[in-house]
Amino acid sequence: MEESAGGSNQTILARRGTMSEQRTNSLSYHITAVKKGERVFENAFQGVSRMILEGEIDKVMVNGKNTFDFRIFRKGPKHIVGMYDEINSFVSFIKDASEGGSSAEMAFVLVGEPGNGKTFLVEYLCKLYRRFLSVPVNRRYTFRFVGLDKLGSYGNITTIESQTYEDPLILAMNLEESRDESGAHLARRYRIDRKMLEKWFENYRPLGACSAYIWNNIREYTGGKFDDMLEFIEIVPVPLVESLGTVTGKYPAKDKITSSAVDLLGEESIQRLLHITDTNNPYRFDLRRGALARVAGGGIHFSDEIYKNKKDLVQVYLGIIQNRCIEIDGYKWPIDTLIVATSNNSEFNRFLAEKEEAPIVDRCRICYVSHNTNHVLQKELTAYAIGNEAKTTLTGDVMHQDPNLNYAASVGVVLTRLPRSEKLTPIETMKLAAGEVAGEKSLKTLSEVIDTLSQEHDITKRFGQKGLGQRNLGRTIQLMLESSETNEGKCMFAYDVFNAFERVILDYVAEAKDRAKFLEDLKIAKGLYRERIMTEMFNAYMDEPLAIRKDVLNYVNMIIGIDAENLGADKMWKYKNPQTGELQALKIDERYINSVEDCLGLKTREQKDSFRTSIRKIYGQKISVRPDYDFMDNLELVKAVTDVRLKSDIAGSGSLIGALANRTNEENQKLYDRMIETMLNKLGYCTTCAQKTIEYFCTQVDEN
């Protein structure tokens, strides 16, 4: 009888063992899946690093220096614009941490002016990470203890999930009482080779206090029988719901009275104490009441305005950043979390002034975030500020957007962000920062200016660190939209943006010195807008959207062909168009070439030859990389060509202004009507902005 009873017990245990092997939510199934590569086991740094580096990587030139552009940050309708240096610093930090470098014991802190995209960058990263983890092979798993009513000391609590979302492999590496025994057990039971085991154990950490305590209770209850112990374990995926704060969680700085360490770490739970009979059980602490435990299983913790927190909270962060561990009353819960934080310059400087707080800064990798200084990229950011929805007036009519609005706003806001320099004028700095041509000045000059400014101890004096931010740009657009002129005309007229900028500068910029500089920058921006309107008027006059572009390219092709060997007496030159690949013929007009160069102020033969050489050099450099390059960023050349064409066609720009301003005779009225028609049908204007633009063109204000 005893033998048969013993035999039947063995059969039951064997069956139970095979059941635990077969269950898809069993630990054995999970270990086998990781072994086969169907699931992954990696820490937070390795996960984020893999997510970024598996995407495409481009090489780009930024402010005269080569850098990398990670394509993953450029996807989606509202993606990250610019921020090349900041993203490169972050990727380097993550990569170092994922390889076990010193970054693993640090937090990454973005410091900069308000409204320059720090929070947006971190939230975008969190969104990418959640999407990355939603792919089945990348999904995070944790474990829970079931059937706890059998143990007797947990009251009505039957199921307990790992409070810090520990990975099932962390449990696997702590199955036995010592690390070595657990490793030997895994190798023996699951036939895991030494190399894979070593790789897993690189991410070894002990179980959190409550998981270890419960696991020990289970061991005592089952008498250490491994198959029986596994029956108490269930593997579950970590929820990816953003609003739960799991995997990616944000902790914004609160006021000094209501905030406490409980918000980060958790606290003793009265509800749990009603059930747990053993007062030594660490499960009496509810860790998920705090923000950290919810992201402790390979997540990202985002601390917004970290240095605004009161001192005792900063001290809590100090321990967490260094030790990667939640500690309450001597109990410890190791965590696997990437900590990213933000701070504005003034709060950071105030914090640095308090010397006793130095240790926390010592444990942070500080990255100074500048405003976007590339006016071409700014067009995307300005489009974000304007919004992609169709605008309406206060009375519900459709609101039109001036085709020059984005350019005017982008140039206006970028110029305020560029520091003054003796080596470069503001316009030269702006053009070089966007990778455009700035006369004789090269990107090397811009690099030197940036390097000199980066020596400044005061961060706000560095390149791009001070200026009107994205929020101020948003306010500017709001002021435009609420004005009566905009609503009555049913159009966001581009020139009105400068009046709105002026209002924002006067109302929101605190320092008088900054206000004076920004207002000066606004005058320069108006001059650039004026030059753009000259071009637009010429295109409208010629009844062709790209008339000026054709004439600029004609000038460039003429100075290339003027020295050609196969140039006949008829001055006809045949060349291959790099954009279309077709063979084209062009008559070289030396009078036209000389007129353009005279307009540029080039009087002597040497000056003209030097200018032509520089244009040919730019052509050689740009066309090989960008066959569609059109020299329209060379504002001086565009202005000269516009002036020459207007003079040759209607005896000077002054005459066009005169004709448009004085419409008493029939001929002038016909010209005005024809230009309005072209602007409406071909150039994207509405009646309001077309009339206002011509009116502005006739005033001759803002000429640089």
For every predicted segment, state its role.
Residues 1-7:
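Iron-associated oxidoreductase/ferritin-like identity signal
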